[in-house]
Amino acid sequence: MNRVTDSGWNHEYTEANGIRIHYVRHGAGEPIFLLHGWPEFWYVYRKNIAPLAEKFDVIAPDLRGFGDTEKPGTPDPPEALRDHMVEDLEAFADALGLERFGIVSHDVGSYVAQAFARKRPERVAGLFFFNCVYPGIGRRWTEPDSVKEIWYQTFNQQPWAAGLVGSGRESCRMYIGHFLDHWAHEPGLFAEDLEHWVDNFLRPGNLQGGFDWYLASNPSRMRMMHEGAPEMEKIQPPALFLWGESDPVLKAKWTDRLGEYFANYELSVTSEAGHFVHYERPELANGEILDFFEKTFREGDV
């Protein structure tokens, strides 16, 4: 494990599950992981890390294939990536000596959080979700006002997609910037950080590393679209969802079946955010996260 301090951020690296994981770590106290989505990397939590670190040990990793974490390539079959990511989290926590922890997650990271909570519920103090996929969405991806929003999920699976998007700085800026603008409550909210996103995704392997997620998740997504919402045992650790109402791709109305998949959950919807609540409304997000984990860790110690 080694540490690099850059612009006030504590960057660390550790080996876990056969790969080198990069993460930013601040604070002390009970541990919480911040798991990002796509098109994101650890830096999407830059407005959250310091406030949360006032009370918690905050760990924001780059997921396998993203950011500065190692990119071992597209697995064969691609679906294996999903299991690898869950195994990464467990091995990563073990490497850090953490037995029980909270998880904040969004988008892709929320798949990892849900799958881990099903596999190892005793290690999860609580789950805090921003807009995310869950099984209850079912066939609703194919509704007329939704199917036009998910074209990128097919595009990202094409073998030439990373080469096309990464062919130049402007093409990368245009593609990644589209989602940061279109999915947010207000266009331009990411303007001050857009070049950081472009820098990140132009690093070798980072575009394909993110696109691999869509190769990995396509079979299960197709099953949901054709067969509908599957029956599954409910996730047991306490969960709180903070959902941005303006999200065009993961709609707030789709939260209506959360109770079928989570045994103990609360839902809060904000009209002043889209897909990226943690970045768009950081004060709201930070307050909700702090309150939730102060409660769940306290109750877990009883």
Indicate residue ranges for each PLM-predicted region:
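Flexible "cap/lid" subdomain of the alpha/beta-hydrolase fold that forms the substrate-access gate
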Residues: 1-12, 20-21, 28-31, 59, ...
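Conserved alpha/beta-hydrolase "nucleophile elbow" surrounding the catalytic nucleophile
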Residues: 36-38, 105-106
